[in-house]
Amino acid sequence: KIWHHTFYNELRVAPEEHPVLLTEAPLNPKANREKMTQIMFETFNVPAMYVAIQAVLSLYASGRTTGIVLDSGDGVSHTVPIYEG
């Protein structure tokens, strides 16, 4: 429901017309990733999607490919070492 609300009420886009970038926490189980992919393709008919680890994208945003990212969120914090991206 959150993705439906985001696509149609917040972004006001047709998801079948836009590739999607999803982020995930480190060590997200493969089953979760597969379910996200299934929902995006089968429910929203997105043309393409990519799933990336949040910490890696944070490091890229700082212009680096190697570093340690401390990702502190609402209910959990992760320290993620990344070597050459």
UniProtKB/Swiss-Prot annotation:
It is an enzyme of class 3 (hydrolase). It catalyses: ATP + H2O = ADP + phosphate + H(+). It is found in: Cytoplasm, Cytoskeleton. One of its GO terms (molecular function) is hydrolase activity. InterPro entries: Actin, Actin/actin-like_CS, ATPase_NBD. Its main location: cytoplasm. It comes from the Eukaryota. Its EC number is 3.6.4.-. Pfam families: Actin. Coiled coil: none annotated. The keyword Glycosyltransferase does not apply. Keywords: ATP-binding, Cytoplasm, Cytoskeleton, Hydrolase, Nucleotide-binding. GO terms for cellular component: cytoplasm; cytoskeleton. Gene3D superfamilies: 3.30.420.40. Actins are highly conserved proteins that are involved in various types of cell motility and are ubiquitously expressed in all eukaryotic cells. Essential component of cell cytoskeleton; plays an important role in cytoplasmic streaming, cell shape determination, cell division, organelle movement and extension growth. Belongs to the actin family. This is Actin. It comes from Oxybasis rubra (Red goosefoot).
